[in-house]
């Protein structure tokens, strides 16, 4: 099964945070599951670093290390994802999350997230 990690899940995994659910940990530790991080999450992290809403000592390179060190695969932004965005219900206003949702729908992935707005869409999600 293919999983798409929301940005906070990448950060919590790297920190070994107690906020990470047991289900999420189980999937993340499962060597047979395909775990992806979208370039969208790196973009979101870069913006939050710039506005100081996110603190990473090593800046954006540290975020990329988190992705690499945990064996997550990187997913680019494809045109198909962008084509879907205008057709999504307007439950979620965050453009990063809307692109993650479009990615998950197009690629038939399960999103790992705590975001209840994401969970309102007719997609597979796990927490």
Language model: regions and residue ranges:
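Short, well-structured N-terminal submotif of metal-dependent ribonuclease cores
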Residues: 1-37, 51-65, 107, 116, ...
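Generic structural signal for small/hydrophobic residues in well-ordered secondary structure
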Residues: 7-8, 45, 85, 104
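Alpha-helix capping/helix-boundary segments
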Residues: 9, 41-42, 81, 100, ...
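Active-site neighborhoods of divalent-metal-dependent phosphate/nucleic-acid chemistry enzymes
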Residues: 57-61, 69-114
């Amino acid at each position: 099964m293919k999983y798409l990690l929301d940005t906070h899940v990448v950060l919590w995994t790297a920190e070994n945070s107690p906020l990470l659910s047991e289900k999420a940990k189980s999937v993340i530790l499962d060597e047979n599951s395909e775990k992806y991080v979208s370039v969208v999450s790196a973009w979101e992290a870069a913006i939050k670093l710039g506005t100081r809403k996110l603190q990473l000592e090593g800046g954006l390179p540290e975020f990329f290390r988190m992705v690499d060190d945990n064996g997550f695969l990187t997913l680019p932004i494809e045109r198909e994802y962008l084509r879907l965005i205008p057709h999504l219900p307007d439950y979620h206003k965050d453009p990063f999350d809307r692109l993650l949702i479009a990615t998950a729908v197009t690629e038939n992935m399960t999103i790992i997230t705590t975001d209840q707005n994401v969970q309102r869409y007719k997609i597979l999600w796990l927490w």
